[in-house]
Curated annotation (Swiss-Prot):
UniProt keywords, alphabetically: Transcription, Transcription regulation
Highest taxon listed in the record's lineage: Viruses
Keyword Nucleus found: no
Described purpose of this protein according to its UniProt entry: Involved in late/very late gene activation.
InterPro entries on file: Baculo_LEF-11
Naturally occurring in which organism (per UniProt): Spodoptera litura multicapsid nucleopolyhedrovirus (SpltMNPV)
Segments passing through the bilayer: none
UniProt record, GO biological process: regulation of DNA-templated transcription; viral life cycle
Entry keyword annotation includes Transcription regulation: yes
Protein name in UniProt: Late expression factor 11
Pfam families assigned to the protein according to its UniProt record, in alphabetical order: Baculo_LEF-11
Family (UniProt): Belongs to the baculoviridae LEF-11 family.
């Protein structure tokens, strides 16, 4: 069986699934210290440390047998583990990430997405056109 690696992206859901599994592992081994702490509580720091300690061995297997190694995503995981509790703080962190140029960066980043969407719409229109004209005998009979 060929192993496929898909380390390019990691979703928040992947991290939360891994956190649940680590917490269940701690419960199974009767290591119950701060297991019930909420992410916003200061007691959750022990869970964060446990996550960081076991990150090198972390693998998430998806249902189509792809797997992701989480050790490649340390920076994103650190960012997700430091949740902001206020909208103002979240906004300030977002602005500082782009050095105060959030508008320009957001515009630049969205351009390829719009191009992808245009290409996808054009490809879908071509497929519909081919389906609609497939039964025609000649080019003159096409009405699309």
């Amino acid at each position: 069986m060929e192993e496929t690696h898909d380390d390019r992206c990691m979703s928040r859901g992947d991290l939360y699934a891994y956190m649940r599994e680590l917490i269940n592992d701690k419960k199974w081994n009767f290591n119950l210290k701060n297991v019930w702490a909420h992410v916003h509580d200061s007691e959750f720091d022990t869970i964060r440390g446990y996550i960081r300690d076991h990150l090198d061995d972390a693998i998430i297997i998806h249902k189509d047998l792809r797997y992701k190694r989480l050790c490649h995503h340390r920076a994103r995981i650190e960012n997700l583990l430091k949740l902001n509790q206020s909208l103002k703080k979240e906004y300030e962190n977002s602005i500082s990430r782009y050095n105060g140029a959030a508008q320009e960066s957001a515009t630049r980043r969205n351009v390829p997405v719009r191009d992808k969407q245009r290409r996808a719409v054009a490809a879908a229109a071509d497929r519909i056109d081919r389906k609609a004209t497939r039964h025609c005998k000649s080019n003159r009979e096409r009405t699309v």
